[in-house]
Amino acid sequence: MPRPRKRFAQHWLKSQAVLRQIIAAAKIQGCDRILEIGPGRGVLTRELLAQAQSVVSVELDRDLCKSLRHTFNDQENFTLLELDFLNLDVAAELTEPLPNKVVANIPYNITSPILSKLLGRIDAPAQPVYETVVLLIQKEVADRLVAEPGSKIFNGLSVRSQYLADCELICPVPASAFKPAPKVESAVVRLTPRPYPQPVQNPQWLSTLLKVGFSSRRKMLRNNLKSLVDRDQLSECLNTLNISLQARAEDLSVTQWIALSDSVHPSQV
């Protein structure tokens, strides 16, 4: 069996308890078609194949692909794609019916682009591709996905993710659950993508506001956004929305960000 490679951020999940938590969180039924990112040695893959209609696993490591083909050679409901998931064109490379759920222990070093590919982007609205996304990720990222407004860890990722999906923390996962043990703690999260359109007039404008608004966390929102919106007009909008003039970006909820975006859009002010 190939050894884990640092350049691929590979850590093999060895905890059966965590494996059961992942499977339970996905609520897999016999009709489900699963997309798995980074199957590694196939520990999770085996459980998915036992419960789902089909599993498509995407793996970049050539040696692991060779091992996976040997292990699951007799599984008719298993498809292995040897490529970088970030380069996968689901519609072009997979046949109908396409996967409806994602269940994966993903490489932590590319978590952000994976989330963008799975959930989409605020500035590029699209109908959700997947019903459910269950991921084993770094706990620091998981905590931000489910963070509450006003907390120190609530940031742009929190707003974007919660705008695009219902985010749930399923369970923490200690480093000892892996071999080799990573230097960080992990967690299982379940993301349920929200159908578009969300109630915002201009998604591109909201995306810009978030990027600029969270650019300097110590500054008040009025100062961060002054390059986009006249300070007096912004103050008036904040007052109308019952948002403190001293508010910082992390103090606003997703709903408040949507309301602010609509209020200060150039067509409205």
Curated annotation (Swiss-Prot):
Database matches in SMART domains: rADc
Positions that bind S-adenosyl-L-methionine: H11, L13, G38, E59, D84, N105
UniProt catalytic activity: adenosine(1518)/adenosine(1519) in 16S rRNA + 4 S-adenosyl-L-methionine = N(6)-dimethyladenosine(1518)/N(6)-dimethyladenosine(1519) in 16S rRNA + 4 S-adenosyl-L-homocysteine + 4 H(+)
Gene3D superfamilies referenced in this protein's UniProt entry, alphabetically: Ribosomal RNA adenine dimethylase-like, domain 2, Vaccinia Virus protein VP39
Top enzyme class: transferase
Intracellular or extracellular location(s): Cytoplasm
CDD domains hit by this protein: AdoMet_MTases (cd02440)
An annotated GO cellular component: cytosol
Chief location: cytoplasm
Membrane-spanning intervals of the chain: none
Pfam families xrefs: RrnaAD
Keywords: Cytoplasm, Methyltransferase, RNA-binding, rRNA processing, S-adenosyl-L-methionine, Transferase
One Gene Ontology molecular-function label: 16S rRNA (adenine(1518)-N(6)/adenine(1519)-N(6))-dimethyltransferase activity
EC number assigned by the record: 2.1.1.182
Keyword tRNA processing: no
Described purpose of this protein according to its UniProt entry: Specifically dimethylates two adjacent adenosines (A1518 and A1519) in the loop of a conserved hairpin near the 3'-end of 16S rRNA in the 30S particle. May play a critical role in biogenesis of 30S subunits.
Family: Belongs to the class I-like SAM-binding methyltransferase superfamily. rRNA adenine N(6)-methyltransferase family. RsmA subfamily.
PANTHER family in alphabetical order: DIMETHYLADENOSINE TRANSFERASE, DIMETHYLADENOSINE TRANSFERASE-RELATED
Protein name per its UniProtKB record: Ribosomal RNA small subunit methyltransferase A
